[in-house]
A protein has these predicted regions:
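C-terminal helix-to-coil terminal segments
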Residues: 292-322
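Phosphate-coordination loops involved in phosphoryl transfer and adenosine-cofactor binding
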Residues: 33-39, 166-168, 271
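Glycine-rich phosphate/diphosphate-binding loop of Rossmann-like nucleotide-binding domains
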Residues: 44-62, 66-67, 159-236, 241-242
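Rossmann-like adenosine-cofactor binding region
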Residues: 212-289, 295-296
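Phosphate/diphosphate ligand-binding glycine-rich loop within oxidoreductases
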Residues: 34-41, 47-159, 281
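Positively charged, low-complexity intrinsically disordered leader regions
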Residues: 1-52, 56
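Short, structured coil segments at secondary-structure junctions
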Residues: 61, 133-134, 195, 215, ...
Length: 322
């Protein structure tokens, strides 16, 4: 394994889940695998769970870790070819990438959507430059259109807590004051479509996710109807993906608070567990009583980020030896 950007890079999910539960029993089982190997984590955007869990995962495997915050202390980077660099950007990404790669064995990149150009975002311009020019294994720590480490942790959590063989899992849009990328819902849909679950997506009209992520999932515009009999509710906001109206890409089309996940919504489920990737806007995405209920999984879900990252880095390290 050399790259990790989506569910297909991981291969068979049952095998990956078995590895995850093996590692959860003994986080240090492979502590010598990363000896004398360095993991470089490059952050173009803020992070809490990804930053901490990925560093912890790398150290579980015996790796050294370097963390670079591109916008704090490093030179400002130009990402476009052909640009006359007479502004405030001192270094081009095309030189910076091979330089950074020379100091490490594996690279993680976190770079959000800019909402300036849908094509640039959905072709993963920044992440793919690292894949193309670094010559090293590269993994996504959340890119413009996907967050596979989060989705893998979500799947681990569902597998741990499910009460039936094939649970009903609902991804629901919820309101937020800002325009947020589609990375988390895209990846969640990507992974749930490969898992053994009854998967439903619900959102207001105009918020249709890209078909390559939705695939065969049922889409329901009536949120209450979607929630009926659900075993897991996964709440997340996302800005308009621009699928039906490209000119609306990245816009906030609605802040309809009736989509906030509250006790009335949860009452029509089958005593469903509540999930969210965090950070969460309380009483916009979800009410206090729901996120604080015993059925809220946001903390164990976040803890599983260490496990998903450990499995991923283990696979990449084993790929170096192949």
């Amino acid at each position: 394994m050399r790259y990790f950007t989506n569910v297909h890079d991981l291969g068979d999910l049952k095998t990956a889940l078995a590895e995850a539960f093996e590692i959860k029993k003994d986080r240090y089982k492979y502590e010598n695998l990363g000896k004398h190997k360095t993991c470089l984590l490059i952050f173009f955007n803020n992070s809490l769970r990804t930053r901490l869990s990925t560093q912890k995962a790398a150290r579980n495997l015996g790796m050294d870790v370097i963390v670079l915050d591109v916008n704090q202390g490093a030179w400002k980077l130009e990402t476009e070819r052909g640009v006359i660099m007479d502004g405030d950007k001192s270094e081009h990404l095309l030189e910076a990438i091979p330089v950074m790669a020379s100091y490490c064995d594996i690279i993680g990149v976190r770079s959000f959507a800019h909402f300036e150009n849908r094509e640039d975002d959905y072709t993963e311009k920044i992440l793919n430059q690292f894949i193309k020019y670094s010559g090293k294994p590269v993994f996504s720590m959340e890119a413009a259109t996907g967050h596979p480490l989060q989705a893998f942790a979500d799947l681990i959590t569902i597998e741990e807590y499910k009460k039936k063989e094939r649970p009903k899992v609902v991804l629901t849009w919820a309101p937020h004051p800002r325009a947020l990328p589609q990375a988390v819902p895209n990846s969640f849909a990507d992974w749930m479509n490969e898992a053994d679950v009854d998967f439903v997506i619900t959102h207001p009209e105009g918020y249709e996710l890209d078909p390559k992520f939705v695939r065969g999932a049922k889409v329901e515009y009536n949120q209450m109807k979607a929630f009926e009999g659900a075993d897991f509710i996964y709440a997340k906001n996302w800005a308009c993906p621009g699928v039906t109206r490209p000119e609306d890409y990245g816009k906030v089309l609605s802040k309809d608070m009736s989509w906030t996940v509250d006790a009335a919504h949860m009452a029509v489920t089958d005593n469903a567990f509540f999930m969210h990737c965090l950070p969460v806007r309380r009483n916009m995405i979800v009410t206090d009583d729901v996120i604080e209920a015993p059925t809220s999984l946001v903390i164990p879900e976040a803890a599983n980020r260490e496990i998903s990252a450990t499995v991923l880095l283990k696979r990449l390290l084993q790929g170096l030896e192949a």
